[in-house]
Amino acid sequence: IPKQGFDKFNIFDEETVNFSERHSQIIKNLSKKEKFFLFLHYTETHRDLVREIIRKEKQESTNDGYYNSLKENSNRYDSYLPACDEYISSIVKTLEECKIKEKTILIFFSDHGTSIGEKEGEKFYGVFTYDYTLNVFCLINIPGITPKNIKKQCRTIDIFPTIMEITGNGEKNSDIQGNSLYELINNKESDERELFVETGGLYGPWPSPSKPNVFCVKINNKKLIYNDTPQTWEFYDLIKDPCEKNNIYKSELMDVINLKKRLRYYLTMNNIEINLI
């Protein structure tokens, strides 16, 4: 996350920090203020995955047992979740102790998912743009608001505009990407929101840590992927093929033609220069 806009920005060693203690103390210090905005980055799950996957597994290997051990890999990931649950409980408890829980808006979200070996070439995340790393959760607790589920596709870039609207700063700056989730929450928006994703892997079949080289556009359960380094296309119907196992790309398909136009739009808008075939 960028430092822009924050009064204070702290970096710490995830190998040694106690997240519950550190973050709870920050909340206690800020609770004396009338208003505050706080972003807490819990990376214990990331740390555990780095220890067990990045440091122990050969990232460039595609013919080892990792890709045949989906159940074991999934169970390993699940074993990290109780610690995450305890962390969240500690944060909520701290808000209660500070007597600010009933006037605090809480937003929990993940920035990405992770691979458990679904696709050869990716053992962690950031290599490809398949849904197992794109789909994430977001929980927003607003005191006094009845719980609702948003089932339509939305994006993490929609979180910031939502915060702006919640806090009464709904007038959107043209430089801000994303849209408030209130239209979806109040059922005033019927269409899914189009998704654009880019990544550049640290490892995998075509690593590109200095610039993105894999891109995708996704809308209405149709998904187009462009892999720039090998210059290959993929297209998936996610209703019929939710695990993205059957690439049905054909350049003459109308869905493909339309999604290519949208991909070009996003590349231009974000000043990304690639040799799009």
Task: Describe the function of each predicted region.
Residues 1-277:
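Catalytic domains that recognize anionic headgroups
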